[in-house]
């Protein structure tokens, strides 16, 4: 039989380190696309993308912002040290000329970042996750907090292959309260299922069948059957995964 052991982690960067650590027995992990940029990952394979992990930039203030350059001079929570959130947030801010000399970059992420924004200890926060995550949800309903619609989203998607341009439709979160009150343009990396090269082909097939059962439904950002799908922005696609996406289940399992 097959034994599945779930291991808690701090996020994509830790997951990647575990997969690359020869002393660690982790075989498969979720890694945010773009996280592995610049890292030697020749022993790892992608099993495909599972879902979107949109970037949500929330900020305080009455003025409507739509460009990251407008955050110069602000206190920005960009994610905890070593997190995938921090790596991608700094990448986007750098592309807009925003760095530690032009803004206060706070090492805060998740609910800690939310508390900082709500407590006026931060002016803006970067969060990655679904619209149902507790951190994102709390700010979508918070008074005095705005969600940035990124006017440069298409440019980001072209400059950074690991990002996709998404639209959060007006009212998609809550039609009764009309949240959001307008269409919002976001960018999103994707959660990638990554496996070590030693992972048995039979296990790859089982993982992908399970992923298809769990992640193929429609959502706010995805169409039915859009996920899982082959993807290799950071890692080469596993030959076993490639066969699965082309032909489906092995012949003897049909």
Locate predicted features.
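An extracytoplasmic/periplasmic, membrane-proximal ligand-sensing/linker region
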Residues: 108, 112, 129-138, 147, ...
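Solvent-exposed, acidic/flexible segments
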Residues: 8-12, 47-51, 69, 78-86, ...
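Short, glycine-/small- and polar/acidic-enriched structural segments
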Residues: 2-73, 77-80
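Second-shell loop/turn segments in exported
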Residues: 3-6, 16-17, 44, 74-82, ...
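Sec-exported extracytoplasmic/periplasmic mature domains
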Residues: 2, 20-24, 94-98, 118, ...
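Residues embedded in well-ordered beta-strands
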Residues: 56-58, 185, 192
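Pocket-lining segment of extracytoplasmic ligand-binding domains
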Residues: 100-188, 199
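Bilobed "Venus flytrap"/periplasmic-binding protein-like clamshell domains
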Residues: 1, 53-115, 119
């Amino acid at each position: 039989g097959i034994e599945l052991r779930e291991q808690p982690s701090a996020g994509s960067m830790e997951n990647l380190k575990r997969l690359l650590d020869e002393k660690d027995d982790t075989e498969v992990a979720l890694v945010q696309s773009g996280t592995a940029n610049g890292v030697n990952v020749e022993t790892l394979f992608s099993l495909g993308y599972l879902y979107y992990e949109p970037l949500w930039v929330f900020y305080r203030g009455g003025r409507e912002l739509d460009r990251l350059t407008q955050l110069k001079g602000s206190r920005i929570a960009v994610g905890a040290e070593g997190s995938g959130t921090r790596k991608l947030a700094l990448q986007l801010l750098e592309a807009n000329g925003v760095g530690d000399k032009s803004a206060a970059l706070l090492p805060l992420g998740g609910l800690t970042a939310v508390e900082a924004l709500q407590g006026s200890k931060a002016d803006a926060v970067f969060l990655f996750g679904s619209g149902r995550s507790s951190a994102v949800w709390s700010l979508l309903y918070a008074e005095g907090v705005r969600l940035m619609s990124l006017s440069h989203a298409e440019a980001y998607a072209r400059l950074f292959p690991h990002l996709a341009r998404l639209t959060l439709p007006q009212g998609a979160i809550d039609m009764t309260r009309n949240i959001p009150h307008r269409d919002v343009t976001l960018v999103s990396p994707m959660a990638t299922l990554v496996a070590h090269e030693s992972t048995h082909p039979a296990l790859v097939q089982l993982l992908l069948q399970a992923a298809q059962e769990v992640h193929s439904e429609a959502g706010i950002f995805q169409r039915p059957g859009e996920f899982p799908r082959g993807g290799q922005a950071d890692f080469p696609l596993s030959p076993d995964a490639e066969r699965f996406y082309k032909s489906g289940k092995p012949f003897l399992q049909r």
